[in-house]
Amino acid sequence: MAQEDVGHLSDAGLALGLSLGGGGGGTTDAAAAHRGGCRRPSPSSQCPPLEPSLTLSLPDDAAAGAAATATATASGGGGPAHSVSSLSVGAAAAAAVKRERAEEADGERVSSTAAGRDDDDDGSTRKKLRLTKEQSALLEDRFREHSTLNPKQKVALAKQLNLRPRQVEVWFQNRRARTKLKQTEVDCEFLKRCCETLTEENRRLQRELQELRALKFAPPPPSSAAHQPSPAPPAPFYMQLPAATLTICPSCERVGGPASAAKVVAADGTKAGPGRTTTHHFFNPFTHSAAC
């Protein structure tokens, strides 16, 4: 403990004073004797010999610690234990003063750093761009026409909107990103619906396949069905033709007349006489004559 206190005192700076006697005023008496000259004491005024004492204190920063040390030395008689206690008190005072100075220096350093950071933040903080309705409408129209701008278009649009070219460029970048994100969401929803439809169709096909397999591997019907009478064979198909009828041939009716009546054979197989005429010629529809 005494070594640590001495180390603190050596860091803070110490002053060593020499005095005679048990109190702190020995130094003053010695100085007065030095100014008055060296006088040999008379035998009648002999007093007990004075013991020299050392006082360790701070130079100017810890006057209170030095005063406390001097008071303790004057009252204690300057023994070894008392010297150790005096050093401890002085070391504590020096450590307190040093701690206070360090805290003040740290506080000033932190405050200056914070002030510099605030200044940097104020100078480099990006403020959000606030556009009017007219500016937003004009930017949207230009974006519908062209999603990207070349440097000349960018500068011209920035002058028209009273903005910086960098602000216009950033707005177009953000707008393209939002458009791409919306399109991605739409595509995702469409693909999700397609996936659900395909999944349902796959399930339906699986059910149909299972039903077909069940019908294919189904057991045969019971044997009692073999004794049942077999159904009658289907009746043969017959086509009924119409009956043969005699019809008048329009061609023969045109060519036939009184001049050729003698040559026409009657339907009953007899020839017609001179005074007998045949008015109509009947024929079978299934036999075609050359005249027809």
UniProtKB/Swiss-Prot annotation:
Induction: In leaves by drought stress. The keyword rRNA-binding does not apply. Residues 28-74 have a biased composition (Low complexity). GO terms for cellular component: nucleus. The keyword Magnesium does not apply. Gene3D superfamilies: Homeodomain-like (1.10.10.60). Residues 124-183 bind DNA. It is found in: Nucleus. Residues 14-85, 99-133, 217-236 are annotated as: Disordered. Its main location: nucleus. One of its GO terms (molecular function) is DNA-binding transcription factor activity, RNA polymerase II-specific. Residues 182-226 are annotated as: Leucine-zipper. Residues 99-109 have a biased composition (Basic and acidic residues). SUPFAM superfamilies: Homeodomain-like. It comes from the Eukaryota. It holds the Pfam family HALZ. Probable transcription factor. Belongs to the HD-ZIP homeobox family. Class II subfamily. This is Homeobox-leucine zipper protein HOX19. It comes from Oryza sativa subsp. indica. The gene is HOX19.
